[in-house]
Design a protein with these regions (language model features):
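Short solvent-exposed strand-capping/beta-turn motif centered on an Asx-Ser/Thr pair
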Residues: 334-338
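Flavin (FAD/FMN)-binding glycine-rich loop and adjacent Rossmann-like elements that form
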Residues: 1-325, 339, 343-360, 365-370, ...
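Structural beta-strand segments of beta-rich domains
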Residues: 327-329
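Extracellular beta-strand ligand-recognition surfaces/modules
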Residues: 331, 373-397
């Protein structure tokens, strides 16, 4: 409608070398819509009579109803995101058709819960509300000056014109949605957040047009991450600031792509508290030259226990900030029987990440049954301030 070039559906794997690109026939090319619903405990038994349009034989048609990972009556709210449909249709032109199918599904599932006799614990619950508009995950994606891809997300490529960021996994859903037999989604998590460049928010085809939200210039795979609401809103903030600068200086949106001008946009965003990965301060900001003084100080030397012991049913870690030497840690460990406790010092391979993917030091402690007092001294120091992980991992003898 605007006259700008756009795409709809998945790219071939060979176009960008994206290994996560789906098989278009088997997996599908589009993510579907979902409608959420709200249930309420009334405190007394409530009957439910399903409307005529409610889906019948839901257990046969929706295999995941037999999978407790996806379906159990203790789950509420967004846990039913997988009631999804429309990935095999046109998610723009067929949206009304998709909505009515989702209504059939929701009322059919609720009828199954209330009237199959398998869920007596739901006797007092009523279906309080069903959404009127489906949540949309994917439709058109416009072509900008840059196309963000899987590699930009996973490898966390640096962008000179970064104005936003994302942190959701690459989250793709099979086009068959709720009627599918496999997993309801496939996710690939980056080791940290990634930058979104301004070039993804501007199209070369229309001089005075910004693109934002789910329709920015990204591949189908990358859209699996950038499509979520907080990421879309963060990009919208960048667009709003860019529009203000363009109006003030009588510029076109594309003029701000210039490496000199983009710095002004980034600085303006930073001054409002807008976070940009890798960018600490904008032009003319005071923190780089500021000095902080205090009339007194308190050095924290000990953290007293404030509860019972934390049971290590699985490995666990403590995330702590360090500025040079790693502090020596003393702690009490209780063992049900003689065993070995491995304590690892881990860090992230990239500054700004919070993934313990680098093991810097490992210590082993033989524990006797009962109470053990341990002193953990890694003898390590780091050149720059960062977060590190103290990881407690059991290796049974």
């Amino acid at each position: 409608m605007a006259g700008a070039e756009y795409r709809m559906g998945a790219e071939d794997r060979e176009e960008y070398g994206e290994k996560f690109a789906p098989d278009k026939n088997e997996y599908g090319e589009l993510l579907g819509h979902s409608i959420l619903f709200y249930i309420k405990d009334t405190g007394c038994p409530v009957r439910f009579e399903a409307p005529e349009f409610a889906l019948k034989e839901v257990e046969e048609l929706i295999p995941r109803l037999r999978n407790p990972e996806y379906f159990n009556t203790s789950q509420h709210g967004c846990k039913y995101w997988w009631l999804e449909y429309g990935g095999r249709l046109d998610t723009i032109r067929d949206t009304e058709k998709i909505k009515f199918e989702l209504w059939k599904i929701v009322y059919g599932v609720w009828n199954h819960i209330k009237n199959s006799g398998k869920f007596p614990e739901m006797e007092n619950y009523t279906l309080e509300w069903v959404g009127l508009f489906p949540g949309k995950r994917e439709s058109r994606r416009f072509k900008g000056y840059y196309m963000l891809t899987q590699q930009d997300i996973i490898e966390q490529h640096e962008q000179y014109d970064a104005v936003s960021f994302g942190g959701w996994s690459i989250d793709l859903h099979p086009a068959d949605g709720v009627y599918g037999t496999g997993r309801a989604c496939n996710q690939w998590h980056s080791k940290g957040i990634y930058q979104i460049p301004y070039r993804c928010l501007v199209t070369p085809d229309v001089d005075n047009l910004f693109i934002g939200g789910r329709i920015i210039s990204v591949s189908h795979v990358a859209n699996g991450s950038t499509r979520v609401m907080c990421t879309a809103a963060h990009g919208g903030q960048a667009i709003g600031m860019a529009a203000a600068i363009a109006l003030r200086d009588k510029l076109k949106p594309s003029d701000l792509i210039d490496k000199e001008r983009i710095g002004e946009l980034q600085s303006a965003l930073l001054r409002t508290g807008h976070f940009l990965p890798g960018e600490r301060f904008g032009r003319g900001m005071l923190p780089p030259t500021a000095r902080i003084t205090a009339s007194s100080e308190f050095a924290l030397r000990e953290l007293h226990p404030d509860g019972t012991c934390f049971r290590l049913d699985c490995s666990a870690a403590e995330l702590i900030p360090v500025s040079a030497p790693v502090p020596v840690i003393s702690l009490t460990v209780k063992a049900d029987k003689a065993t070995r406790l491995t304590v690892e010092l881990r860090s992230s391979s990239r500054r700004g990440n919070y993934t313990p993917d680098t093991t810097d030091k490992r210590l082993d402690f033989d524990l006797r049954e009962g109470e053990n007092r341990l002193t953990v001294d890694f003898g390590m120091r780091y050149d720059a301030p960062q977060y590190v992980f103290i990881c407690f991992m059991f290796i049974h003898i």
